[in-house]
């Protein structure tokens, strides 16, 4: 209201306090936290890295996420004298665990804007998203105090009772798996299922995407969420393909299910045979990008083919490539499953290599 004598605006102190509170609250709520996520240059297996950028008035759209930079000399991606590397945003997802948060997957670029040698995403040749990928990500919940999987039996109970099991004697870490699933779904990731695996403390989730790059993005974001979630429980996530060594326990893989228009529509066993045969002469090239220490897993035992051999067959889980029975029942219209990739492999590099081989087939 107005003071009629002084003819100047007059505000009650309560209005001023309320205005200050609302203004401050708006400024806080108008801030967004963008978590830039990238892969470092460590070998033989890259690690996830991330850092947070706080921005104002963010639209939530990928095109409004700015390029950023980081110290590549601290991640084995640059020398100290010229250490800046660039982060190019390629995918964005809401972060359900942080207020006004977003998870931003990025590619690493050199300072001149070219793709860094560690950038597997840039090697994918699938501009029209004709290739569809479904990755089956296995992992172990690892107890740092015992240096063993969560729930690993002291009496050396043999594997068998733990796969898709229920009960406190058989299933370990279900709460983490369930929370991870919920967070991934809330973030918009296309998780299609989860299950307990053959060993205690071993779990799996499956992600599918119509597009190779997006499938890789979602696997890496899901891995990031899982690593961060495990921090709450004081546990580590172990993606080593054979963390228990040369024992009678299954290792961890990341089976790659894939298709393109030809595989989805051809209706021809001959075409499937030709595509599978295209993989035979390039076993070495595939194994090179299918994950470190995979020789410990691909032994010919525990539902694997030997690392230096190649085979394919209908419903054959001991083959390099399995032809799913559903593909056959649908008249040879479906997909293939490469069972060789290890759980620690880079899905970008897996997809890039598979696409290159499929395109080379004489069909």
Predicted features along the sequence, with ranges:
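Polybasic, lysine-rich low-complexity intrinsically disordered segments
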Residues: 7-8
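Glycine-rich, acidic/polar active-site loops that bind/position phosphate-bearing ligands
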Residues: 26-363
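Residues marking helix boundaries in flexible regions
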Residues: 17-21
């Amino acid at each position: 209201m107005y003071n009629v004598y002084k003819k100047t605006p007059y505000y009650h102190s309560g209005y001023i306090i309320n205005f200050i509170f609302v203004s401050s609250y708006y400024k806080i709520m108008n801030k967004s936290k963008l978590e830039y996520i990238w892969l470092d240059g460590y070998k033989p297996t890259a690690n996830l890295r991330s850092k947070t950028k706080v921005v104002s008035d963010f639209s939530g759209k990928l095109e409004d996420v700015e390029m950023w930079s980081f110290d590549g000399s601290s991640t084995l991606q640059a020398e100290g004298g010229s250490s800046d590397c660039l982060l190019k945003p390629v995918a964005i997802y809401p972060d359900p665990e942080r207020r006004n948060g977003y998870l931003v997957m990025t590619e690493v670029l050199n300072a001149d804007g070219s793709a860094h040698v560690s950038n597997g995403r840039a090697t994918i040749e699938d501009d029209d998203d004709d290739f569809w990928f479904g990755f089956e990500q296995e992992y172990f919940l690892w107890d740092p105090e015992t240096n063993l999987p969560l729930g690993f039996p002291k009496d050396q109970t043999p594997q068998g009772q733990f796969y898709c099991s229920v009960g406190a004697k058989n299933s370990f870490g279900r709460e983490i798996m369930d929370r991870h699933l919920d967070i991934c779904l809330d973030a918009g990731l296309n998780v299609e299922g989860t299950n307990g695996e053959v060993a205690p403390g071993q779990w799996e989730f499956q992600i599918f995407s119509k597009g190779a790059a997006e499938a890789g993005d979602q696997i890496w974001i899901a891995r990031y969420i899982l690593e961060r979630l495990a921090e709450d429980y004081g546990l580590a996530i172990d993606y080593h393909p054979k963390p228990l060594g040369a024992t009678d326990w299954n290792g961890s893989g990341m089976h790659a299910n894939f298709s393109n228009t030809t595989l989805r529509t051809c209706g021809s066993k001959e075409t499937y045979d030709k595509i599978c045969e295209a993989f035979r002469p390039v076993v070495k090239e595939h194994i090179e990008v299918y994950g470190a220490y995979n020789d410990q897993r691909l032994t010919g035992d525990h539902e694997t083919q030997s690392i230096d051999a190649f085979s394919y067959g209908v419903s054959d889980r001991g083959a390099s490539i399995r032809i799913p029975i559903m593909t056959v029942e649908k008249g040879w219209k479906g997909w293939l499953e490469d069972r060789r990739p290890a759980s620690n492999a880079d899905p970008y590099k897996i997809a890039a290599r598979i696409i290159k081989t499929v395109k080379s087939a004489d069909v």
